[in-house]
Amino acid sequence: MIRRGCIIHGKNVGLHGDRTSTGAHCIAARSGMSVMGLLKLYIGDKTTPCPKCGEVGVIVDGDYRHSNSAAVAVDGSAILCRCPQGTHFLIAPGTIPQLSVAKAGITPSFAPEPEKHAQTGKKKKREITLTIGVFFDGTGNNAVNTQNMMKAYTAGHYNLDDPEAESILAKCARDNFGVSGSGATSYTGYYTNIHWLSTLYSRRFAEDNPNVQRAVYIDGIGTDARKPDSTLGQGFGISDTGVIAKTNKAVSMLADSIQAALDAVSNQQADNKLIVRVLQFDIFGFSRGAAAARHFANRIQSEDPAIISAIRQGVTGTDFNGSPAGKTRFIGIFDTVAAIGTPVNGLNPHSADTGDVNLLLRPGVAEKVFHITAANECRFNFALNSVKPAWPELALPGVHSDIGGGYLPVTKEHLFLTRPATETVPYSQPGEKTQAYRQAVAQLQTLDKSPCLAPLLRTNEISAETWHDDRLPPDRYGQMQKRSFAALTLRERTVRNDWPRVALRVMLEAAQEAGVMFDSILSKDKELTIPDELASLRDKALAMGKAVRNGQTPSTFSQDELDVIAEKYIHCSANWNAIVVNTDGLIHGGASPSEMIGFINRPDEQWQRTVYSMDGKKI
């Protein structure tokens, strides 16, 4: 074996003929720099057909710090094909095999064309409509990190349906990936509806159908694949993992995605000359990803030069008759929460001010828009950015991630529904006899009036709990004293993550009405199966969505139906959790964090969600 001897920032440089994680070989497309006679690989270079999915892959990332300003492919560089994102990547070992790659029949793509191909006759024209589906995941959601985490988790023979899975995942994230706390959010959650939509998005091309689709998945705000999550991005939606940065990432992936789609069609249509008659987008998003989807759609409508340039690069070598920046066919969004912290609004994500993020969806921005919102969400930091009355919007039961997804299959909730009240009392005084306890009990009247909480209160046991901190000195009379706390709690509650599958189907139907093509959900897809007790409620939700899209007033769920959903399937996202609970489930410590920073999931005023119109006014 011959040592490769070419390394950039600790990683081996990719060379012509290198294998990939799926067994394909990489093909250099640029003449110039070589190592031992093998040309270097760069972003945009392709692979032989992937043995797993059959599609030619495209190298989509590398090291941008190379001296000649080109992005050089290195060991681990991602490769885009039809395989799940994160599973196909370049393998650049430290040595070069003695066997020449030329013997394997892998020729650089810039090599002179054989004479017999140069003399091909006139080809028949074939017009296609190319649709790029762009899928913006939610804040703290990253399908690549989730997938890698699931592999590590299952390798440890853990059960994902274990209610304690969240704590086990946190340990796995720390032990296997070196991430913890807020840096591990995307490693300890689960797949969202954005992930499922991107995997179901049909990439099949039929000879009798001119429609071609290609999916581009964008990881969620505050996250990067295989990196710790960003506190700044998750908290305020800004910086290099913020909302606008994610739309920039989508633009940077356009050219390669377009070229890969055209290459796949060309491989099936070798005797035809392709003409792209229309290039259009389907754009999906959840949470801040929904804000990114809206901002990206506005960039398309305004004919952003960066998008025009990316499209031109992607269609190079193919006739293109569409609009320079393309157009948007469908925007499908789940519970838009922009929550942008800016210097102007004092870094307050509750503010209507979204800085440079453009949420306004003007007429003509897309052929169809559909927004599903969370009827039971009421957190202060999760104000809703509505699209009503300009576009159809349906509120379904559930909180934010009951609609967009991302909860683990089974979770156990230990929640403080009120901010703990506190007072210093004699050590012998029972907690139930304190003013703090009476204040906590009195707040139950406020909770009872909240439509967001009503189904949960009807179907779960709410308790008034007391605890104390006895690490206090005696009073001036020498009497022992304690710091007594009290709060309303919701404890030992097990919740399943099946309801988001209903919202997924409502969005699928809306998108399909707009012409979007998806593969069918198969009965073997257990992760997307709906429990029998939710089947009729799914049908009702589908009918409600159709009514809203037709401009009609939808029916509503009855109290009994809401209680069925709430008992086991609606999470309680709003809480005052900043309290330490020990391994025995006992509470200790107080409530010192500030409301803005420490209680990030605290409820909005009166447990009523703040809703902003597209022009930033409270509704």
Describe each model-derived feature in a short phrase.
Residues P112-I619:
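Active-site- or binding-pocket-proximal scaffold segments within functional domains
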Residues M1-E115:
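Intrinsically disordered, low-complexity proline/glycine-rich segments
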